[in-house]
Each structure stands twice: as C-alpha cells, then as structure tokens.
C-alpha cells in the first residue's frame, strides 16, 4: 500500500469514527470506539480489507489478516457486507444484526443503516440489478431495498419499508411497497457529517 492509499484509508477511518462517536475524533476516541462500538470495529476491518485488496496485495499478510478479522466479525455481529462493496466515507451502523448488503451495491457518503436492513439484488424483471444509495440517506430497521433502484440524496426509509422503485432526493418512504409520504428527508437522522476531509 502506497502513501496515498494509506492516507485515503486514514480519512475513511476518521470519517466513520467521527460519525459513530458523535463528532469525536483522535487516537483515544478511535481506541474507545474500536473496543466499544461494533459498527465501527466492523467497518475498520472492512476498510482495511478493501484497501489492501485495491493496492494489489491480495495474498499479503495484511490483506489476509484483514479478511480473516472481517469474516470473523461478520459472524459475530450478523453483518453481511462484503469488503468489495463500494461504500463512501462516514458510513454509520446504528445497531448490528441481520444486516445483508450485496457486494455490487454502491453506497454514498454519510449513510446510516439500522439492524435488519437488506440491500439486495433482483435477478429478473424490469428492475434486475442492485440499488445505488445516494449520500446522506437514512435506512430504518428492517427496511428492504431490492433491485436496480436509485435512492436519492438525503432520503429517509422507514422501518420495515420495502423499496422497489426509485426515490427522489429528500423523500421519506414507508410501507410495503414503499411510497413517498413526505419530502422532509433524513434531516435530524443523519448527523455529524462535518468531519475534516484532509
């Protein structure tokens, strides 16, 4: 891993840490979050596995160690997010357990997910494919987003909603199938997005 990749990895870790700890950062905060916050610990190893793979070190000791820890934490916490998944900085896992995300999904920056969330692939029909999640999106407990749908920037998806159609920016969606019930978006749910980016 070269210096630019190490720097990019540090920025991802810092953004995730800042969001998980409500605006705190620094080495002692990072150590505390690693020990006490399962969502941050999981993302720490996912980011390391992804970056060491991207640097061409598929069979290096750091990559293999990161993959091993990532796999261990997948089972321990019930979070099935492959390290190959494209996830922007500031990813926040509010509660863990029963989280399943397809590896081809694209997730923007500052996205919140809750327990029981499924973001998956549709294998047939007009929405064959995987979702693209915009930045600043809140996904509530038990929500399902499936197929080639686009979730607009700043949207909020309610608990147990099933999203099978595109959502515009700042949409609030609820129900089965999900429908837009307001355009107030995720304001108040997605917080601490002002982390330093350099």
Indicate where each model-derived feature is located:
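Terminal amphipathic alpha-helical/low-complexity segments used for targeting or macromolecular assembly
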Residues: 1-77, 188-198
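Broad hydrophobic/π-residue packing in well-ordered secondary structure
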Residues: 36, 43-53, 114-115, 138-140, ...
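Conserved beta-strand-loop-alpha-helix hinge in the C-terminal portion
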Residues: 171, 176-193
């Amino acid at each position: 891993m070269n210096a630019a990749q190490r720097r990019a990895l540090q920025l991802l870790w810092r953004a995730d840490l800042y969001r998980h700890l409500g605006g705190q950062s620094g080495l002692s905060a990072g150590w505390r979050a690693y020990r006490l916050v399962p969502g941050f610990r999981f993302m720490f190893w996912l980011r390391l596995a992804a970056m060491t793979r991207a640097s061409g070190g598929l069979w290096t000791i750091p990559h293999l160690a990161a993959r091993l820890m990532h796999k261990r934490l997948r089972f321990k916490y019930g979070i099935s997010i492959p390290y190959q998944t494209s996830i922007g900085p500031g990813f926040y896992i509010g509660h863990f357990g029963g989280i399943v995300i397809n590896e081809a999904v694209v997730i923007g920056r500052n996205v919140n997910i809750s327990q029981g969330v499924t973001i998956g692939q549709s294998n047939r029909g007009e929405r064959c494919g995987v979702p693209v999640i915009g930045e600043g999106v809140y996904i509530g407990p038990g929500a399902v987003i499936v197929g080639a749908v686009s979730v607009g920037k700043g949207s909020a998806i309610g608990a147990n909603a099933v999203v099978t159609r595109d959502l515009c920016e700042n949409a609030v969606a609820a129900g089965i199938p999900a429908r837009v019930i307001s355009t107030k978006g995720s304001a108040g749910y997605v917080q601490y997005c002002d982390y330093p980016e350099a």
